[in-house]
Amino acid sequence: MVFSNIKSRSGQKMAIITSFFKDEAYGLLGPQMAATVIEDNTPYDCIVIAVTREAGRTSIKKALVDYFGKERPIIGFSALSGREDLFSLALELKAEGAITILAGPQANVDFVGEQGWQNHPHRFKGLSANFNFGLHGPAEQVIPLLNNLDEDDRSEIPGLLYVDQDGTVNQNTPKDWDEKYLRKVRWDNIYILKRDAIALLNINMGQVLQHIGCPYAARTRATEIDYPVSIESRQAESIKLQLRGCSFCDVAVDKGFYGKLDMETVIDQIRCLPQAQDGRKIPFELINENPLPNLPDLLREVHKQGLKLSQINLTLRADWFISGLQHLRQALPAAAAAGIYVLLSSIGFESFDDTILRNLNKGISVEKNIQAIRLMRQLKEEFPNQIGYSTKEGANHGFIHPTAWDSKETEANIQKTIYLYGLQNDILPPHSTPLIIHHASGLGDWIREIEHREQLWFKRFGSIIGWWESPHHL
């Protein structure tokens, strides 16, 4: 399907551009639910355009021209993964007359810019020049904006960020989450660039939201984070911080922990999932960082409602897997009776060195990680056809490497643990994930404190702080 074949109800159109990985076929709950909210509550038709790093700007702009025709483009940008190519695309489209809106996670801090950038020229200056508006918080906040685009007074639009005529950035307080907007999602509204055209993406993996935010980010914890190894003279020193959640997690700062959604809301989302050829719902990731205590109740309700599921993917911390294991054992026989496969798709191990785990503020130890792995392997022996956990079965567990604290000692500890417990056989992902420091994460505060103390500065790459480069003297 190409854009010119997409029929508009009213001639008013909007698109949401989001970052995507090549050759994947998963859905994107946030942008696709936002597009659904827009279509159901405004005169606008809305699609999601998933853009990989390989996509050429000329191809993207041609697709937008084909979609919008002579209408002024209204384009949202969400979940951009810090991609500077998409930041500059938004700036170019805005200069050409499009209305561009930055939304999704970290929209507020990325629109406003890094803390103290006005007095520190090397810091991320924000994206207020790239976008007409920012929108932080629930997607339905865009409804009054779209219904009043030509109004000058925007002070009553919740969650909106915009620049006054005098250059001042205004931030309106966002509204609370409202579950009536979280019940429905269209999964047939996402498109990709393919052979110089836009094609409908037939997804094979969906998402269902059960928790907003992470329970580990619900409260603040005192922590100490070591200096990076790049500053050799300070290896015995650390920075004291008050952090919510893992130190690298910008979502912990963005959302914290809102809480659990009603079972009815979760079931309504499951109903929206497409069916596979066998009549069952396609596999989905359950968005809940601590899903095991509620899993038996969810499966009972699914059975009560007559829903046919194929596979549930679970993402959680290693310690919460251990503490919730009895609930998983309770749920697996019910899953077996219903023909549902459970995949422990991503356990947040992140490292197998205690120093690095402490600096990541994970709140767990290598011993806990290994205990979880032993229990996962044991569970697989008990329920060989009902549960999966290994990379061969499609799991992709958290493993952050390299980090700012890598040394000969940490490397030796990690390699020893990997080979002692055979982690390369079933746990380690094909590629590790380098430590990424978003400017608004806890580690962003850590970097800025080091810069202040040592009169140094680290290079910024858009919204990301380049910890891997040698620092410069002020």
Stretches found by the model and what they are:
Residues 1-44:
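A short, flexible N-terminal coil/short beta segment enriched in small residues
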Residues 159-163, 169-215:
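Extended catalytic-interface subdomain
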Residues 47-176, 426-430, 440:
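Glycine-rich beta-alpha loop elements in corrinoid/cobalamin-binding modules
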Residues 199-263:
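Canonical Radical SAM [4Fe-4S] cluster-binding loop centered on the CxxxCxxC motif
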Residues 8, 13-23, 159-164, 169-173, ...:
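C-terminal accessory regions of radical SAM enzymes
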Residues 34, 63, 85-92, 120-123, ...:
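A general structural detector for well-ordered alpha-helical segments in enzyme core domains, enriched
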Residues 63-69, 117-126, 219-221, 232-239, ...:
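Alpha-helix termini
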Residues 7-19, 74-76, 101, 255-396, ...:
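Conserved SAM/AdoMet-binding glycine-rich loop
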